[in-house]
Amino acid sequence: MPIFQWLKRCLCGDTNITIDQAIALVDEEIANLRKLERGYQTNIRNAENARDQTNVQIERDSFNDTIRLLQAECNLINLEIPTLNEEKFAITRLKSAKHFFGAVSSLKEGKALECCKEMIKQVDEDGHGRVDYKEFLQMMKTGDFSNR
């Protein structure tokens, strides 16, 4: 199941997967792709060595075809890894947003206003007691509530 489907299920509440588990799944997928790519690179080197040791043109052509196919697979993997890293970054931002809105939500439940005041103080870079758009955007990009 693609990571976005897991994430959607997590947000919609129809699974027990947590955001940290979703991040771990993305990390695992990236590690698996890197391992696969290393295997392809080994196979490419082996095919190049075998090609270089033969004088039969048909065999050389066959090795060249194999090398091209393996290189194409490596290229696909190298395109997928940045996409997965972007997904991981989006999930991390979601975790920050859930924390932020959880703190705001706790006010409705009568929980300590001090929690939100402390959060605002941590994010408020210019010390004027408010979180402006730039500060909020920075908090959401970094996933960090403490800019100081």
From Swiss-Prot:
Residues 111-146 form the EF-hand domain. SMART domains: EFh (SM00054). Induction: By touch and during darkness conditions. Residues 17-61 form a coiled coil. Pfam families: EF-hand_1. Keywords: Calcium, Coiled coil. SUPFAM superfamilies: EF-hand. The keyword rRNA-binding does not apply. The keyword Transferase does not apply. GO terms for molecular function: calcium ion binding. Potential calcium sensor. This is Probable calcium-binding protein CML1.
